[in-house]
Amino acid sequence: MAEGGEREELLSPPPISPAKRLCSWPSPQAHHPRGTPGAAGGGAGGGGGGCLAPGARPHLQPESLLDCAAKTVAEKWAYERVEERFERIPEPVQRRIVYWSFPRNEREICMYSSFQYRGGPGAGAAAGAAGASPVEEGPPPPPGAAAPAGSAPGAAGAGSSPGLGAGTGTASGGCGGGEGLPFRRGIRLLDSGSVENVLQVGFHLSGTVTEPAMASEPAVTYKVAISFDRCKITSVSCGCGNKDIFYCAHVVALSLYRIRKPDQVKLRLPISETLFQMNRDQLQKFIQYLITAHHTEVLPTAQKLADEILSSNSEINQVNGAPDPTAGASIDDENCWHLDEEQVKEQVKLFLSQGGYYGSGKQLNSMFAKVREMLRMRDSNGARMLTLITEQFMADPRLTLWRQQGTSMTDKCRQLWDELGALWVCIILNPHCKLEEKSCWLQQLQKWSDLDICPLEDGNYGHELPNITNALSQSASHSPDSLSRPRRTVFTRAIEGRELHWQDSHLQRIISSGIYTAPACQRENERLLFNSHGQPLWLEHVPTACARVDALRSHGYPKEALRLTVAIINTLRLQQQRQLEIYKHQKKELLQRGTTTITNLEGWVGHPLDPIGCLFLTLTEACRLNDDSYMEMSDMNESRLPVYQHVPVASGCPNSNESYLSLALEVALMGMGQQRVMPEGLYAQDKVCRNEEQLLSQLQELQLDDELVQTLRKQCILLLEGGPFSGLGEVIHRESVPMHTFAKYLFSALLPHDPDLSYKLALRAMRLPVLENSSSAGDTSHPHHMVSVVPSRYPRWFTLGHLESQQCELASTMLTAAKGDTLRLRTLLEAIQKHIHSPSLIFKLAQDAFKIATPTDSSTDGTLLNVALELGLQVMRMTLSTLNWRRREMVRWLVTCATEVGVRALVSILQSWYTLFTPTEATSIVAATAVSHTTILRLSLDYPQREELASCARTLALQCAMKDPQSCALSALTLCEKDHIAFEAAYQIAIDAAAGGMTHSQLFTIARYMELRGYPLRAFKLASLAMSHLNLAYNQDTHPAINDVLWACALSHSLGKNELAALIPLVVKSVHCATVLSDILRRCTVTAPGLAGIPGRRSSGKLMSTDKAPLRQLLDATINAYINTTHSRLTHISPRHYGEFIEFLSKARETFLLPQDGHLQFAQFIDNLKQIYKGKKKLMLLVRERFG
């Protein structure tokens, strides 16, 4: 990294001479109290803080030459080198160097004390676009070369305004956007005056911070110590015992006190300087007073050191000089911010152990954002922190478990791994890293990648994307197999980055100057490097080129990233124009065939490197209005929408009026409109959808002004005319990723400005080719052709349900917008009927159209209402022969919709019922609702209209009864009861069907209806037929048909003796349950027959005898049923049922005693039981006790 080793110095030092004082070499132990000496990484830039830099003079009073020199030396040189370089350093110079060595930028304190940071990620880019940033005026150095002086940390200069060149922060919210964050709490402690006793001795700052008293806790004072070097905090110590990745609030408070109130801090030179000025007596007095003040702590150590010093052979006497913890770092020490590595490991391990919970994923994403923030500040701790995070990820025990079980990781975990891999690509493509650093990272990445548990790039699927550095041109001819690569892990793309470099002269010119144009006299090999306007092109695999942009942007080169982005977009434009020309030559042939095998194997949306998202963010950050009050604390958790402005593109073309914002919109549209084949695997397909939604949410933040609308319209026309190369072309590959979600955004954005274009585009996007009939494979000789890998309809489209729902959302959006426009609604209806294949989704659209057409506060839209009805009718036809759990709801809704349309719609569905409904639905729901009193009132029908509806309903009822008498006979009778002829026909249908497949319950139901309507003889006939279909076993005493049997017997009894005599043989034949038979017998003997008979018949007035016909037959059957049931129950009876059995015999005796000789018959029956079942002694004892 930039600060990972010494760069070009301000002065060229002569050969190192011995130090002027041997008692001032720094102590590593003192600098690293937590045991992390020499931590890898580096520090952030020292740009100015949110307030005036410490000791800075008013604007009109320039800094003194001493301060200017001291600031630079304090930032660039270790103090030991200063001492070695100059034999004598005046005390005022020493004081200014020590003074300026403390960090000057509050942002850096915030970065190490908070996950969140509100510094406007586009700060650097915006400044770079305006040409105001003092950072990186030249191109980034190639890997391994020394970076320019301006690229080192703090190159922005101590006096530069916040955000210029060093603006970072990828997480939303304020620096400490929550009350509990250390940075926020540190500011509160500082503002409340809790920081006291601040003392700076050389490169060591100390003080006390008092936590105010709480309701249940007293005030507590903590001692805080901070060591620093070259504008970086190198170690911290606090009495609170904080265990976290970030600095505690007390360290923050002390640091901010030093930044904001430097003049109130007591400043002393390093303690070795003070000791050097003392004579022997003063030194002795100093030591003795020091020991006296802290004798309990330091006396043993003091005596030990004294013994060693007095011993001539001791190790301490073999070394010149003595350590000084306040003298700053040594030359050999790495200059980096303090980062508690152990806490980073512990925190990541803790978050991973929490599984896929939302909170842990959010925290890990915040850590990734912190890495990006460090990278942009060019802080080498970014790479070190990412290494620590990756080590813990690779140590996650779930990786082994998932591999052993053959299961895939969760989506949330997969997304974290993707971000990890993307960050490593940024690290490897760092334009200012050293070759040895890059080599070290690559070795570690290769080691991780070689492990069996290392996650693969796109799951367990073999089809891979092209290699990052050897990606083939999109116009090359390749089959899927030829693009397959060996096992690719999440680190493979970063490892492939070893082949990329920054030394290409054309690339260097692109990123070094915004006005780089084609030379007047071009050589043969230079003609392809520029477009017709002389603007430079960058002809590289698009995702790889975008990875370069991300690396530049991530490492604090905003202007360079913008320049390369513009070159990439010019290249994409040229490619788009060439594809249009190719399509024009093949348009006629493709339209005749109606199909194509041309496709892009690699999509930019959902790509692991997120090329479109990278370009879009780079461009929009250049246009984002920054909030200068980045240090203000916000108690509001909601994030505010960003505000953008047009920033002109720095271009060598004088007539170019483009802005970065319009380019951002254009490249997003080009990327999402790219035709690409659906990738393999659930995760890859889900990632396509998720990435598209992310890009669209970012697009929706743009306020479309005239310039952006013009860009939008132009790009939409190009997409429509793009043929098979555009996802919105006329003919596309059958497996192309659908454009529904994208088209919905385009439709909504374009509608107020160009309705015709918006509808044309949205209607084109409605298709879902993979569900439509495939045609012939076509000509495979074209370089873009790819034979379909979907032999059947859609075997590998795991996200098909989501895609269909997005298709439905697009149609619903158009329906809402087209309200009142008959022609557009008719066109849209045809598109829906052609392209949407899910009945549930069409039903949803029909419901949406119905709601829009029938608002509660305005008149009904008849055209849209008819569209709703048409969609409903299509749903009925689609689901008529299939199972759908919402079918009844759909039928009821359709009748409601037809009612709203009018009586002609109801008549139409009644007349064509057989194409829409099952017989049961037609009679029980459709016809019944159509002729209901509610419908008549709703439509205010006159008599002829009511009769027409009723006639249609009767015709429907008879047709349904003929087709399905079992289910529709009763409904047909109900619908026809007001028309004698139709009623007779329905009754005859029921009688004819009785001998067929109708069940006893259906016949009993119809019979009861006939009795209710006043047709008892017809009811008796149907009941008799029902009895012939019934069979009640001896133990079915709770059968649901018992009530029907009792009702039938009561009906026959009420009609007269003859009807009862006709029914009893049927009862005896069908019913074998003794209790039911005895109940029937009892009921028949209670009243005389014919009491409730039909008019004209008279009752005999005499009760019927059980000894005579027809009851004698029923009595004998009942007694036999009791006998048979008794024997059946005794076969498997248990003691707990003895009491129940005795009660059963008691009921049986009541029936036995009805005839004159019944008591003898019952006694004989009991004796037989005692003889047959004498082995059941306890039971027989109970029988004797009850019955003798």
Swiss-Prot record:
Disulfide bonding pattern of the chain: none
UniProt zinc finger (SWIM-type) residues: 222-259
Disordered: annotated span: 1-46, 123-171
Keywords: Metal-binding, Zinc, Zinc-finger
Any Pfam family the entry gives: ZSWIM4-8_C
Compositionally biased intervals (Gly residues): 156-171
InterPro entries, alphabetized: Znf_SWIM, ZSWIM4-8_C
Ranges of biased composition (kind: Basic and acidic residues): 1-10
Compositional bias per record (Low complexity), positions renumbered to this chain: 126-136, 146-155
Domain of life of the native organism: Eukaryota
Gene Ontology MF term list: zinc ion binding
Protein name: Zinc finger SWIM domain-containing protein 5
Gene symbol of the encoding locus: Zswim5
